[in-house]
Amino acid sequence: AGGILRGTTRPEDLSCDQLSMTATHRTLGQTGYQPTDPPRVLVQLRADIPYLTRFVLLRQLADTVVSEAFFGINDDLESTATHTLQTTQRIIEILCEEGLSSNALSTLNKAREYHRELGIHDEHFRYAFLVLATSMVFWVQDFTDARCSSEDKLQLGLFFSQMANAAGIFGISSDIDTYQCQLDAYR
């Protein structure tokens, strides 16, 4: 019992604004959202926010990546691909800031390298998901044993599994086996 859940803000305690996702296909037309606008959830990711709250908001960012890749932003492939990668990079930067992954910075640099070398096309999404799934692996490895109760560990495992499956849809099957082995080690 306890774990990271003890003494922290519960997801149900968060305001609707904190839990709002701006970059979903359903919301884009209603809010006038533009690819250059940072997701509003980023504003909430401050160091003084309880750990579980930040975890919930990171999940919002990951959901944003999935939504953008499936539905696009204003039907503009270039803007969608660029913003998807930027959002993914921000997730990894947050992991670095939280000290949750010693490998996150190198992963972020790889994402930027892919962005420079590959240009904008469908393959771009595969690498965005690859980077996201990789960051989830490092994240789970770095704090599971130290911070998480069994219940929390299961929650993280399910989240990572969903991200890995999303990556698989975009054809990263050769990497998913490796990620699945990492996930199985924590079950």
Question: What are these model-derived regions, one by one?
Answer:
Residues A1-R187:
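Mature, function-bearing regions of proteins
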